């Protein structure tokens, strides 16, 4: 049951007919994991905190550098040298002190227990981390909302293969290969800051729809491609790989 402070804080959300107080209660009862506290992780964590996701855990072992500041909007000049996850938690609490939110400074790997989370935000720029998140989310039947951004382009997808066997997983579409992977990180390829802000905001928007809305048809099973030069947003229907080593069995 929402208290008076909740009703005031989330007033502009709960008046939406398909959202209402029940939707807000579902958000407040949601445990979410954010992997990455950089260009995507910052807007994801800030908007998830503002929306009232009740418990948030953020993983990132990296420290803040001056070259991060064009896009990692929670981090400021006087935060340089601080751990990204720790700093992001403090900035989120300034927006919403009523949620529970903690940071983890260790590297995210396959030993991390994700069983208590309801959904996972993939905000990493490391290919191996994305495969690990995909495997864990499938195994433990979690919603995985994955974003990526480089230069002036972004991608977004919702993966629910563990919840519905008809959906593809990340590895169905991006299979592991022995070939050298293309450069997908901002450090080497470059990034325009607002692109990460847009994709991160879309990740939270999808999470809110998955958790809070009553009558909602999931966008899982699609890949969304954003082009910052043309403002095009393309939607590609994805097919399950029935030979996929992660989700085919």
Label every PLM stretch briefly:
Residues 1-249:
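Adenine nucleotide-associated cytosolic modules
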